[in-house]
């Protein structure tokens, strides 16, 4: 699923407030007792993620970038509420003027990229120009070109191909000024996403960087730098030699580096982790309960943490099968076997769910809107199968994803699709997002798709996942290609609301859109599960709630 960071729930629910700490607190209370050095070895199934900071938009990529990026403001390497407060990093302060439409950041001296070049205000202007660039097609563009949300002056024109310089971003000395078309209380939550980190001009403006052969190929200004990226094989991080403690640079840095191996066999990698040959590895569903029984939960080697994510089956409303076919989309929602689907992931994985907002989304309602009812599903579907053919994209890596795809295929057959008319297309790891994100793909449905919140506001769910005008040629996240004028207007109107009314309207729209439009079938909520070697020092495990994973700079080996 996409990484999706989420901020403290205290942020944005009032429509105006923002938690910003005035100074960087000490990152880890026990960090002084932790061993320095060592390479953290992690293995995973599936294909590798994208690594270009203006392109990468999946969970593992943002976890890595939390270790490599330097941002205007950032989140401390702390768990709980303390980790959800924005603190100054490269910017020492900012001021808001012109009725909330002008943000001026003061950039510190002392930050350097891993290739030795100084980080300046222009490093952030370049990041914004890359995000907005039409040819690069960054998924981050939606966060700065939104007429109902954050809209940087000139960003939409650049994104439409009219030039390469975002006119609303100005640099004068150590001052970075960003002008918005209108005031937006969510701006700081968005400009601190990894898309907008300090970016080296070594990265080409118009095309993606994917291969890294040394520390100079993808310079970064955080505690670590990516020194190698062999696509689908190995991604390596090592300490940034030019990152030294100082103002804004108070983060921990215990490990010498991290090596992430891709495309491993799930059971083999689990066995390697159990034998302490890997420090972190995959956890097959069949092994979860045994590991929990042997090591306990959240004590030594097995850990589980909830995440603000929802799993679903998008139905492509732009392709023939589900286009103008509400009855069939509703039928799928009644036909799927959610409990069996979730069970394929094993214990501690999450629970069945039926609407978009999970319990971590402000405005969510504790209700079940679809229950398994095959008779009703068949009644709704009757006469709406069109040519009877359906193409389903699914994740082929690991054991859980193919098992879930098999459950969905059985559900489709029970609904009335014949076996020989169901085409299953497998994709390794995050490759499924690239395939489904291209407008015009041949998928009618996707399996094992998921969404995790960027920040705790319902806008980040309905308006990002389902707002039609945001659809572009590639890197889409509206995998349903849902573009309905009536619902577009409702989403745009809801985006203008604040406070309790905003949450009430969005909470009802979540239920309404699932019942009356059904562009997807919701399957589940999620927990993260982790299995470690006995080399891992649990005192260094800091679960960063924003990135919903362990902080790499805080991690340590015994």
Residue ranges of model-derived segments:
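Gly/Pro-rich hinge or "lid" segments in bacterial periplasmic/extracellular proteins
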Residues: 77-81, 183-250, 257
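N-terminal lobe/hinge region of extracytoplasmic solute-binding protein
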Residues: 43-98, 219
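Alpha-helical secondary-structure segments
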Residues: 41, 119-129, 173-179, 183, ...
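Aromatic- and charge-enriched surface segment that lines or borders ligand/interaction sites
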Residues: 92-143, 177, 322-324
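Ligand-site clamp/hinge motif
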Residues: 209-215, 242-291
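Surface-exposed binding/hinge segments that line
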Residues: 106, 123-125, 133-202
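Detector for C-terminal structural segments
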Residues: 335-365, 399-409, 435-558
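Short helices/loops that flank or line small-molecule/ion binding pockets
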Residues: 116-118, 123, 267-279, 285, ...
